[in-house]
């Protein structure tokens, strides 16, 4: 189900709790909402749809939403400076990101996974993990 986007900086600045199997439907809604906004958005975190739970969805290289539950960056290299926009905020803001990252997360079956990402996909994952931590760029 496509949900409304939260734009309150106060709500977005609150850290998220860890996701459980009871939160799988939120991940589905998050993927649906990202797909509905894919013309101007490459990733979303659950707090952007009003859920304070650590779930992100990022468009993969094929343009499909990849949902990650409880993502955590476990390796990174190649820091760089960039400017990022956000669907829930106006304008672009400076950010420091890593060119390449490895992320541990759980999939939609709550199985542990590890993935390596680079480029825009890595940048989007870092941005959405910041959302889970209550960091608003």
Feature-to-residue mapping (PLM):
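Positively charged
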Residues: 1-137
């Amino acid at each position: 189900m496509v949900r409304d986007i939260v734009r309150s900086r106060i709500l977005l600045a609150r850290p998220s709790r860890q996701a459980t199997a009871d939160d799988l439907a939120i991940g589905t809604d998050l993927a649906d909402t990202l797909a509905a906004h894919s013309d101007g958005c490459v990733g979303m975190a659950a707090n952007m749809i009003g859920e304070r739970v650590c779930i992100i969805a990022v468009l993969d290289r094929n343009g499909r939403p990849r949902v990650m539950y409880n993502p955590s960056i476990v390796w990174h290299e190649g820091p760089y400076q960039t400017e990022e926009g956000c669907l829930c905020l106006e304008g672009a803001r400076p950010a420091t990101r890593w060119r390449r990252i490895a992320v541990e997360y759980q999939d939609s079956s709550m199985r542990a996974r590890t993935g390596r990402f680079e480029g825009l996909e890595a940048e989007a994952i870092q941005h959405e993990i910041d959302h889970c931590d209550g960091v608003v760029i």
